[in-house]
Amino acid sequence: ERLDEDPVALTYNSFAERIVSEHGMRIGIDPDFAMLSEAGALDLMTQIVEAWPTDLDETLSPTGVVGKILHLAGEIAEHGYTVETAREALEEFGRELEQVGRGNEAARNVIDANRRRLAFLGPIEAYQQRKRDMGVLDFSDQLVLATRIVREAPSVRAALRDEFRAVLLDEFQDTSVIQMELLSTLFGDHAVTAVGDPNQAIYGWRGAS
């Protein structure tokens, strides 16, 4: 009876933004939140890094450090981690590397890189706190918060499932972990068709496969 309706086309982020703007109050998010642009994120992280009391990575320029930290922050969100769970995973990885990598130069390089990533978590925590203080979200926040909303609010899940009776996912090979978590929470036993080609995957760094 709904065949005369036009299909709704959304990116994952625009879909997540809609969920957060319409239902964010359920988890304490102001519906009038502002989005932090890439330039704004870069400026904010630059301020944090410049004020950081220790040298975060002596092998990189300050601009390079900022870029690496923002990239790691995005990876953490896209994989569905928090800073704390990321810290636990990196610490465990580091302990395992220490056991197997003694005397191995290649392993030492990986150990050093892992230590730098652990050091980056402090600025990421500061960045997240500054965003909360400013009342802004970045693109990764949209997906994390939307997933939390649909997980914690059954009425929101029911309303969205009723609105989207059938779901078509394009370029499915580029779906990240957090995007998949959002989709499976909402539409895990729903009418879903996914189209993708694993040979064209370009977002493996964020968990897509």
Which residue ranges define each predicted feature?
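Conserved helicase NTPase motor core
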Residues: 8, 33-41, 45, 73, ...
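Generic structural signal for secondary-structure transition and capping sites
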Residues: 24, 54, 78-81, 155, ...
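Conserved P-loop NTPase-based nucleic-acid remodeling module centered on helicase motor cores
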Residues: 1-72
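Short, polar/charged, Gly/Pro-enriched helix-capping and turn/loop motifs at alpha-helix termini
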Residues: 30, 55-59, 83, 134-137, ...
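Short acidic (Asp/Glu) and glycine-rich catalytic loops that position anionic groups and cofactors
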Residues: 24-25, 103, 193-197
